[in-house]
Each structure stands twice: as C-alpha cells, then as structure tokens.
C-alpha cells in the first residue's frame, strides 16, 4: 500500500507535532499506510509531552516528493508554511483551525477547518465519528496540543469545545489537565541554552499580508526580561533574516505565561504598522501588547487589516 505522509507546519509547535502523530494513527486504524513526519526541530515544550507520555517524535523531513505522491496537512494550509516541495505532491486532506490563504489544489480534497483553538480538538471529534478508541498515550499528546494552543485555556482562541475535549482527553490519559498543563508550559518557557537563531525560529510563521511579506515568531516565558535582556543579539539575527527573506516586517513576540501580556520586537521597514495596528509607540523597537497572547486571533488579523488599510 502506498505511503502517505502526515505533517504540520514548519517550525512546528506542539499541535503541529502531536496532531500529526494522532491523525496518522487514526488513518492507520482506518486502513491507510500513514506516517507522521515533522518539518522542523521539536521544541522543549513538545519534547516534554513526548517524554511524559513515552512517545517517539516523528522523523524530520524538508522535502516529501522523493518519498510519496500524496500527503495530508494538519495545523496549516498556507504553502509557505509547508514542505519545501509541497507543489510537487498531491494534498489529500487538510485538518486545520487557521485562516485559509495561499492554498489551492487541482483535485477535490477532504478539507476540514473549524473555528476552534486547536487541531487536536477536531481530531478528538474525528476519532469518535469513526468509532476509534484513542490510546492513552495519544490522548496525552492531544491534550498537550490543546493546552499549548490555548495557553492552558486562557487564550481568546480557546472555545468550550477545546475545554471539553481537553477534559475528555485528560481522563483517558490519566492526568490532571491543570497541573500537567502548567508543568508542560513551564518546560516550554525554559529557554536556557537556546541560541538567538533558535529563539526566533522556535515557533515562527510567514504570512502574506496585502503586498507585505511578514514573519511572526512567538516564544513563551515566565519573565519576558529573561528573553529581552538579549535584545541587541536578537535584533542582529532578526535583521539578517529580514534581509535574507526580503521581509517587510519580522515581529518577535515574547508572551508572559503568568500575566498573559506580550512584548513585541518589531524589525523591518514596515515596523510602524505595528504601531498603527495596536495604537502603541515603539520604543527601542519594542512595545508592550497588553492581553495579547494569540498569534492566530490577536496578531495575524490585526496586522493584516493594518497592512490593507
């Protein structure tokens, strides 16, 4: 039987990795030869979840066409966030919870996108719809994805469906969602030992906003100053990325997981758009973004609107 690769976006977060594993397992149960893979390094937060539930991480690939003809995308749809040669393969399915942009296919596909906080929430429904029992370990990973994407249910992207799914999955996994979740988020917020290059690419995504090419990277921290103490070095590596990729804006967002506020470091010729979007003034290229924790709901649409205004 021909193999199908299942993967999330580049610079994968916990949902991208865990939903690839969970959906590949569901597809295998339904008779498909599916293998989860990843398009980037595994973060400390995701590794914590994999270790806790004793699951091996997917192997790393940059290109897919040399291996397979067909792929399934989870947690993304935009071409620039996908495999480097995504144009050379057929996308069979997409399971996602983001905006739909820069995406088209030559054939009809199964496309499931719901306005929930996490791909794993959708997968929880799909397991039920197909009458497949979720293994304890996979339930733990799916729970981890929801906790990560919802910042332990505090993000404005979090819906009642996400909370309900998390409670169900926690029961299957045999953990307390709140205490496990805080432990996992703290593991993800431990940025010690990371290079500046790693920090700005841990969870980074590229977007086309009007005519502007924008990259938004986000890291969680227990104290934003632990990251911003390295601002000069961060600006140096970000400026290099801006030049290399021809970006109009690179916004590096440091989110405090305790206060649920963020600090944005804006580099590029369109940095002033951040000021316009949030009605703030950049001081030394940074601004506090009160109550902003979600790239999907509080950054991407706000910046897109500002660029198009």
UniProtKB/Swiss-Prot annotation:
Reactions the enzyme catalyzes: diphosphate + H2O = 2 phosphate + H(+)
Cofactor stoichiometry and binding remark: Binds 2 manganese ions per subunit.
GO molecular function, one term: manganese ion binding
Pfam annotation, one family: DHHA2
EC numbers: 3.6.1.1
Keyword list, A-Z: Cytoplasm, Hydrolase, Manganese, Metal-binding
Organism domain of life: Bacteria
Residues annotated as binding Mn(2+) 2: 15, 75, 97, 149
Gene Ontology CC, one term: cytoplasm
Compartment(s): Cytoplasm
Predominant location: cytoplasm
Cofactor(s) for this UniProt protein: Mn(2+)
Chain positions recorded as Mn(2+) 1 binding sites: 9, 13, 75
HAMAP family: PPase_C
Family listed: Belongs to the PPase class C family.
Protein name as catalogued: Probable manganese-dependent inorganic pyrophosphatase
Organism encoding this protein: Bacillus cereus (strain G9842)
């Amino acid at each position: 039987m021909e193999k199908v690769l299942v993967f999330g976006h580049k610079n994968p977060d916990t949902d991208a990795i865990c939903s690839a594993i969970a959906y590949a397992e569901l597809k295998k149960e339904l008779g498909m030869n599916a293998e989860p893979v990843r398009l980037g390094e595994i973060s400390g937060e995701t590794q914590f979840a994999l270790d806790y539930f004793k699951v091996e991480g997917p192997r790393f690939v940059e290109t897919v066409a040399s291996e397979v003809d067909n792929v399934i995308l989870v947690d993304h749809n935009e071409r620039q966030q996908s495999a480097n040669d995504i144009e050379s393969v057929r996308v069979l399915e997409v399971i996602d919870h983001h905006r739909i942009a820069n995406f088209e296919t030559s054939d009809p596909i199964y496309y499931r996108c719901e306005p929930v906080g996490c791909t794993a929430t959708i997968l929880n429904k799909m397991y039920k719809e197909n009458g497949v029992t979720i293994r304890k370990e996979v339930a733990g990973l799916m729970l981890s994805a929801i906790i990560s994407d919802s910042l332990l249910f505090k993000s404005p992207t979090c819906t009642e469906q996400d909370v309900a799914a998390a409670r169900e999955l926690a029961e299957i996994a045999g953990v307390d969602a709140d205490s496990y979740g805080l432990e996992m988020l703290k593991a993800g917020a431990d940025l010690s030992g990371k290079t500046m290059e790693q920090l700005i690419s841990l969870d980074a995504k590229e977007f086309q906003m009007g005519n502007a090419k924008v990259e938004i990277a986000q890291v969680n921290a227990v104290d934003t100053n632990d990251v911003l103490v390295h601002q000069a070095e961060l600006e140096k590596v970000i400026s290099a990325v801006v030049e290399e990729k021809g970006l109009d804006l690179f916004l590096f967002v440091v989110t405090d997981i305790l206060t649920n506020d963020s600090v944005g470091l804006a580099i590029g010729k369109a940095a002033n758009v951040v000021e316009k979007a949030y009605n703030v003034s950049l001081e030394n290229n940074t601004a506090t973004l009160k109550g902003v924790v979600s790239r999907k709901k509080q950054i991407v649409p706000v910046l897109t609107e500002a660029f198009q205004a």
